[in-house]
Regions:
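Non-globular, low-confidence helical/coil segments that flank catalytic cores
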Residues: 1-126
Length: 126
């Protein structure tokens, strides 16, 4: 497991939203890589891309439950996932995932699974 974000400690710092203090990790087992984004939003995605962090992953846990503020086209180009997982509650008040994120995944031909419609999702590796 490698922690990719944050780059610096958030201790003693103020954030506009709690999502700015999000932790993002990559799990690698053999050749399989899984990117866990937590509630990461577009500004952090852009920062990771600008710093040329290797984001390539086979499995992407979609950021911020599929909110419109995450999973940008630029981020999807950097990650190039084979499949995406969206952790979201059924009939949630925010109506996540948003149609814009689902459309982006479709445009990139990335199949996805949602916990609200698919239930528990298990990712297996060699």
């Amino acid at each position: 497991m490698t922690i990719l974000f944050p780059f610096d400690s958030w201790q003693g710092k103020e954030t506009a939203t709690p999502h700015e203090a999000n932790v993002m990790v990559i799990l690698q087992y053999g050749a399989m890589r899984m990117l866990l984004t937590g509630d990461m939003e577009a500004p952090a995605e852009r920062e990771l891309i600008a710093k040329q962090v290797d984001l390539n992953a086979d499995v992407l846990k979609v950021g911020h439950h599929g909110s419109r503020t995450s999973t940008t086209e630029q981020f999807l180009r950097a990650v190039t996932p084979q499949v995406a997982v969206i952790q979201v509650g059924a009939r949630n008040r925010y109506r996540h995932p948003t149609p814009s994120v689902l459309d982006r995944l479709a445009r990139f031909a990335i199949p996805y699974y949602r916990t609200d419609t698919n239930g528990t999702i298990v990712v297996e590796s060699d």
